[in-house]
A protein has these predicted regions:
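Non-catalytic interface/linker regions that flank or bridge core catalytic/transmembrane domains
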Residues: 1-35
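A general alpha-helix detector
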Residues: 3-8, 59, 132-136
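Acidic/proline-rich low-complexity IDRs
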Residues: 10-11, 22, 53, 171-173
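Generic detection of long, well-ordered alpha-helical segments
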Residues: 13-17, 50-53, 141
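Generic N-terminal helix/loop capping motif
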Residues: 14, 26, 30, 59, ...
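Divalent metal-dependent catalytic cores for phosphoryl transfer on phosphate-bearing substrates
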Residues: 37-45, 51, 63-174
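Conserved hydrophobic/aromatic pocket- or pore-lining residues that grip, position, or stack substrates
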Residues: 56
Length: 174
């Protein structure tokens, strides 16, 4: 997990974006490096969010260099590593909490669900994580219009903004 954190910080600092050091402090404090990425699917485990974000960067870096070499490298880094930032939570509350099930019979102790290890935090008002990601990042760094769009639309046809995307795709979003 420490390697993932170090690599993430190294990449984000390499963008030279004013305020990035402050964003890194907030990411650490909010649990970005220890948060799961989902409730039960991809990387639903401690540290899954940071690992997923670094994996996305690896793919975006390779593909953008081949398909869209004109896209700014700093934008690729920022969008890849911050696209799911809101999944860590906000307002001092984690986005996901452990899904504890009641024990029964001989195993009366509560236990973490093996099929859905996490659930959305009922103490955190629901806001799309894409919106949270932009809000959190924008407190510290200036995102370009294209970076905002790419983060907001990163779930494509599977996200809540699917109807706003068609015909407005950009190389950074793709």
């Amino acid at each position: 997990m420490e390697n993932i954190k170090n690599r993430t910080e190294e990449l984000l600092l390499s963008t030279g974006r004013q305020g990035i050091a402050d964003l890194l402090v907030e990411m650490d404090e909010m649990g970005f490096y220890t948060a799961p990425c989902s409730t039960q699917y991809h990387l639903a485990c401690p540290g899954g969010l940071a690992e997923h974000s670094l994996n996305v960067y690896g793919l975006m870096d390779k593909l953008s260099g081949i398909l869209y070499p004109e896209v700014d490298k700093s934008s690729v880094i920022l969008c890849a590593l911050l696209h799911d930032l809101g999944k860590a939570g906000q307002f001092g509350k984690p986005n996901y909490i452990i899904n504890m099930l009641k024990g029964r019979g001989k195993n009366a102790e509560p236990y973490q669900s093996p099929t859905k290890p996490y659930i959305g935090n009922p103490d955190l008002l629901y806001i799309d994580h894409e919106v949270r990601s932009i809000q959190i990042a924008s407190r510290h760094i200036d995102l370009t219009e294209d970076e905002n769009w790419a983060i907001l639309m990163h779930n494509g046809m599977y996200g809540n903004f699917k109807y706003q995307i068609q015909g407005k795709e950009t190389p950074l979003y793709l």
